[in-house]
UniProtKB/Swiss-Prot annotation:
The lineage of its organism: Eukaryota, Metazoa, Ecdysozoa, Arthropoda, Hexapoda. InterPro entries: BRCT_dom, BRCT_dom_sf, PES. This is Pescadillo homolog. It comes from Anopheles gambiae. Residues 569-643 form a coiled coil. GO terms for biological process: maturation of 5.8S rRNA from tricistronic rRNA transcript (SSU-rRNA, 5.8S rRNA, LSU-rRNA); maturation of LSU-rRNA from tricistronic rRNA transcript (SSU-rRNA, 5.8S rRNA, LSU-rRNA).
Length: 643
């Protein structure tokens, strides 16, 4: 007898578990199941045919892949979560009997989760962990600003603060910071670590305000925080040893004073959090970083067309690392201390602040060697002539443009220029005019400081990158010009062939041989512009030799005259119609299995065009309003002068 195939026992119907079935399989409640999935990186799946995956049901359910649930069955943490359930029941039982000693003993023996093997399992290589460092640092920086609550414990907030300070010290020592930006969400930082870009957000330092429970589930965020603290500890350890720094961080010199005698650990942690001290190195060197030597490419640029761009980018990054070298900054009390200290230290500058503001100040406000004082107030009573009083935005804009900007636009009380985001694409559809001006200024400086590569093959002609890659618009114009020229030449040839016989009959027999030869050459030559100009020059020379009275009359055929060509201009309406027809044709040529993806790409392009158009219109309205306000202001000033 043939074995019968039952429905939903194979194929897509046997590939998925619902969340309830997965919890029953693992014998866990919803809280532990969520925590386990977060730690292991298991997420719900979307089946191709939901009705088949749910055994005929069309209800929207959370589905997990059967292989993922089978993978969780072999996880040792599952046993720890089950033991926690038993301990929770025993602790409640001891508290109900008011046996506090037994309750404390069971709390002390409460099973702890060990996540080391999960970190190694999810990130087999160190570069894989660096790629996932964005969310890790963003969450830890947020937890470091939280107070201790019932869910977010004090131990988690302290560990988050320690790990973030250690990470900032590494970025300072490695000079890895590349981009900074201020937004309503916080401070954006982007660093280049081991060839990977890491972007994280530091929230603004405002007082903590509790939220409603339905807005954010802090228990889920705590699960992420527990995993990210273990992960960040491993990463900081590897990063510190990669640049020969001692981990955990220590001071490069001893601090024997009355303050350290009381609580040395607290004193050292505060000084490290100040971000203003050099850390101890394992190789015994000082904190000064040596400038890396740029190796010149001695081969042909034809083999690697982007060598010049790579070389220029390396030079720009090398200059950026020492942007604030030789400058001394002093921070006023009203400006945010930690982000500014972090940025200035990353680019080689020296910084200090008021001693009553935070520990770790190295010089006072009265120091005459201070070059810049960062303030955020309209005016100050006492000012020093030897320094510039600037607003904090100058530091951020100088880093993003990779040059020291003029300070006159950032003076105390001045209206600041727009703060442009560095996280934009070069091929963006809308670019603000201020950003275009900044790009032109940067390109002008790069042209002044050109780099001359080593010449090895001087015999071969060097072709620059601009010559190799032609502009598509210029190429199209050249093609249009060539087509129009060919059309005019063909039309002139046809006219000449029809009038050639009549021109031969009209020739005069009394002309001399020189005029006949000139006429024959004129009839036989082509109608190219260059050759006609040569013939005209020869004719003018002969006319100068002959007397004025014997000047011959030219009997060239009328068809030989050069006519001015008309410039072809496209009709915008017809062009739009043709573009729509081509787009419809491309959509028909897309295969059925790729149509959904193609429609998404088309919608994305339309959305980008719409956003660019809206931004351009908004900018135009703002500029128009500014001009109207300026005109109104000028009118009022004129009235006041006349009055």
């Amino acid at each position: 007898m043939v074995k019968r195939n039952h429905k939903f026992k194979s194929g897509e119907g046997a590939m998925y578990y619902t969340r309830k079935a997965a919890m029953n399989k693992l014998q866990l409640n919803i809280k532990d199941f969520r925590q386990l999935c977060i730690l292991k990186g298991i997420y719900p799946r979307e089946p191709k045919h939901r009705a088949r995956a749910q055994h005929g049901s069309r209800e929207m359910k959370i589905l997990y892949h059967k292989k993922d649930i089978t993978f969780l069955l072999h996880e040792p943490i599952v046993w720890t979560l089950r033991d926690r359930k038993i301990f929770n029941r025993r602790i409640k039982h001891a508290a109900a009997k008011q046996n506090m000693n037994l309750r404390d003993i069971r709390l002390h023996n409460y099973p702890q989760l060990k996540l080391d093997h999960i970190v190694k399992e999810r990130y087999p290589t160190f570069i894989d962990a660096i790629k996932e460092l964005d969310d890790c640092m963003t969450l830890l920086f947020m937890f470091s600003t939280f107070p201790a609550t019932k869910i977010i414990t004090r131990e988690l907030t302290r560990m988050s603060r320690r790990l973030t300070v250690e990470f900032m010290h590494y970025v300072i020592a490695a000079q890895a910071l590349r981009k900074v930006f201020i937004s309503i969400k916080g401070y954006y930082f982007q660093a280049e670590i081991k060839g990977e870009t890491v972007t994280w957000i530091v929230p603004h330092y405002f007082p903590y305000s509790p939220h409603r429970g339905e807005m954010v589930d802090l228990s889920i965020m705590k699960s992420f925080g527990d995993f990210f603290t273990v992960m960040a500890g491993f990463i900081n350890y590897r990063l510190y040893h990669s640049i020969n720094l001692v981990y955990p961080p220590q001071f490069a010199h001893s601090l024997d004073s009355d303050e350290t005698m009381g609580n040395e650990q607290k004193f050292v942690s505060e000084r490290i959090a100040a971000l203003n001290v050099e850390l101890l190195r394992s190789d015994g060197g000082n904190g000064d970083t040596e400038e890396p030597e740029l190796l010149e490419w001695t081969g042909n640029d034809e083999e690697l067309p982007h060598v010049s761009q790579i070389r220029q980018e390396a030079q720009n990054v090398n200059k950026l690392k020492t942007l604030f070298k030789g400058l001394k900054f002093f921070l006023n009390r009203e400006v945010p201390r930690e982000p500014l200290v972090f940025i200035i230290r990353c680019f080689g500058g020296k910084v200090s602040w008021d001693k009553t503001m935070f520990v770790g100040a190295t010089f006072d406000e009265s120091d005459e060697t201070i070059t810049h004082q960062i303030v955020d107030r309209p005016s100050m009573e006492k000012q020093h002539i030897s320094r510039d009083y600037i607003q904090p935005q100058w530091v951020f804009d100088s880093v993003n443009q990779r040059r020291l900007l003029p300070t006159n636009k950032y003076f105390m009380g001045a209206v600041l220029p727009p703060h442009l985001s560095p996280f934009t694409s070069a091929n963006a559809r809308y670019v603000p005019p201020e950003e275009l001006a900044a790009r032109k200024a940067a390109e002008g400086e790069e042209e002044e400081e050109t780099f001359e590569p080593a010449e090895v093959n001087a015999d071969h002609e060097h072709i620059s990158d601009d010559e190799e890659v032609q502009d598509p618009e210029n190429e199209q114009e050249m093609q249009d010009y060539a087509l129009m020229k060919a059309f005019n030449d063909e039309r002139t040839d046809s006219l000449n062939s029809g009038k050639k016989e009549g021109a031969d009959d009209a020739t005069d027999n009394g002309k001399d041989a020189a005029e006949k030869k000139q006429q024959q050459n004129g009839d036989g030559e082509s109608d190219d512009e260059d050759e006609e100009e040569e013939d005209d020059d020869d004719g003018e020379e002969e006319e100068d030799v002959m007397p004025k009275k014997q000047k011959p009359v030219s009997n060239k055929p009328k068809g030989m005259a050069v006519r001015r060509g008309t410039v072809y201009r496209e009709n915008e309406a017809e062009k739009k119609i043709v573009d729509k027809q081509e787009e419809a044709l491309r959509a028909r040529m897309v295969k059925s299995r790729h149509r959904k993806l193609y429609s998404k790409l088309v919608e994305r392009e339309k959305k980008a065009d719409k956003n660019a158009r809206l931004l351009a219109n908004k900018r135009e309205r703002i500029e128009k309003q500014k001009r109207a306000e300026q005109m109104e202001k000028q009118k009022q000033q004129r009235k006041q002068i006349l009055a």
